[in-house]
């Protein structure tokens, strides 16, 4: 059965007693039991059934089950945001005195989590150029607990060799954890490239309409202790499980993800090619362009599509602000992969609290605009960009 059919097929998915064709929304907090013995068996894990909505809910379980079928993951856990998913997977693999090997080019909040929050608890980090395998090998040692990366960085659109990184990780007996938000898991097979755990913000492509927060951890089962810690410890003690309304919306979003993503990716490629011909745009960064330095590696790892994020560089920060202010169709908003096209100036928004020196180290330029391409007609998007450039 093809992935698009699996995403929509409800006959093979856990359903409710009334045979609801669409996923039912369960908003209850607790569940009633027939007797005390059954209640004890459920709460101690001898019988599998929901006991409390902070750790299990049928609507959320439905989403987890569908994602598991689509991805081939051994275990899927849904969290209430992308950052909650990232935090919990890192909580599961690290401890005081351990070291996370990661990129200098991380999403701002992820970088702050690793170098700030976790550092306060005694967790170290090595910020590397993950495209430089020798540098990563030199950073890996007995204290390392994982290699963590984004499969395509935001907004730099840098791509690292996942197989090479997985070999370094597995030589040390540690997992390779990949944030796959930029390319949907339905389009890739990261497990075949040596990725042990995928983490993603389901707020983005799965939500689509920008109406629900969520995050997913897709665990491929190569390190059994990870799922044991997430399901047996962190869900209970951290309390970051996805809320049922988000799961309901994102399950419906999953059913149309294939159609929406392919349109967005096609729009992005068409627009990226045309942007190179617009006077005033000094650089266009998109891995689907044949002259992009990561073009071949991206196609090898992620297939024929390159996602819906484009970075453009203008002459100055002032030119970027003027461009954003002039937009009429494209929205000034910070989400990614919404149905609508969005634009931000990353250096002053999602990286706005970082000092200039650190922005330079992260290759976040004051001249960069990030575009998240939506479902509008691509020529209408281009017309708006042209008039905004002036």
Report residues per predicted region.
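N-terminal "arm"/small-domain region of PLP-dependent enzymes with the aminotransferase-like
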Residues: 1-57, 369
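Conserved small-domain helix->loop->beta segment predominantly found in fold-type I
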Residues: 269-328, 332-340, 353-360
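Short, solvent-exposed beta-strand edge segments and adjacent coil->beta transition regions
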Residues: 47, 245, 305-309, 366-370
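Short, well-ordered beta-strand elements within core beta-sheets of diverse protein domains
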Residues: 249-259, 307-315, 370-374
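Short loop segments at secondary-structure junctions
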Residues: 30, 219-224, 314-318
């Amino acid at each position: 059965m093809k992935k698009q059919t699996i995403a929509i097929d409800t006959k093979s998915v856990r359903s409710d007693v009334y045979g609801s064709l669409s996923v039912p929304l369960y908003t209850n907090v607790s569940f009633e039991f027939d007797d005390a013995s059954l209640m004890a068996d459920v709460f101690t894990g001898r019988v599998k059934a929901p006991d409390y909505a902070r750790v299990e809910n049928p609507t959320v379980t439905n989403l987890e089950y569908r994602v598991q079928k689509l991805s081939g993951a051994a275990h899927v856990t849904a969290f209430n945001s992308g950052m909650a998913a990232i935090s919990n997977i890192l909580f599961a693999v690290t401890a005081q005195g351990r070291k996370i090997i990661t990129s200098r080019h991380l999403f701002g909040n992820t970088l702050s989590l690793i170098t700030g929050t976790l550092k306060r608890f005694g967790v170290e980090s090595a910020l590397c150029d993950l495209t430089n395998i020798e540098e990563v090998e030199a950073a890996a040692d007995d204290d390392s607990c994982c290699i963590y990366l984004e499969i395509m960085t935001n907004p730099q659109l840098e791509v690292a060799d996942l197989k090479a990184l997985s070999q370094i990780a597995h030589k040390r007996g540690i997992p390779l954890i990949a944030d796959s938000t930029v390319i949907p898991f339905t389009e890739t097979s990261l497990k075949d490239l040596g990725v042990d755990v995928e983490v993603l913000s389901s707020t983005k492509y799965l939500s689509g309409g920008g109406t629900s927060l969520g995050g997913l951890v897709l665990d491929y089962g190569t390190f059994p202790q990870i799922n044991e810690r997430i399901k047996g410890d962190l869900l209970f003690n951290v309390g970051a499980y996805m809320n049922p309304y988000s799961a309901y919306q994102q399950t419906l979003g999953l059913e149309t993800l294939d159609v929406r993503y392919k349109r967005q990716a096609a729009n992005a490629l068409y627009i990226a090619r045309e942007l190179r011909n617009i006077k005033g745009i000094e650089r266009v960064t998109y891995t689907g362009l044949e002259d992009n330095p990561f073009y071949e590696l991206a196609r090898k790892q992620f297939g024929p599509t390159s996602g819906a994020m484009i970075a453009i560089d203008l002459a100055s920060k002032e030119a970027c602000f003027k461009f954003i202010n002039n937009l009429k169709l494209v929205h000034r908003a910070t989400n990614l992969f919404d149905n609508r096209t969005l634009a931000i100036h990353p250096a002053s928004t999602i990286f706005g609290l970082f000092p200039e020196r650190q922005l330079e180290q992260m290759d976040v330029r004051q001249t960069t605009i990030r575009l998240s391409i939506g479902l509008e007609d691509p020529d209408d998007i281009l017309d708006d960009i042209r008039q905004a450039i002036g």
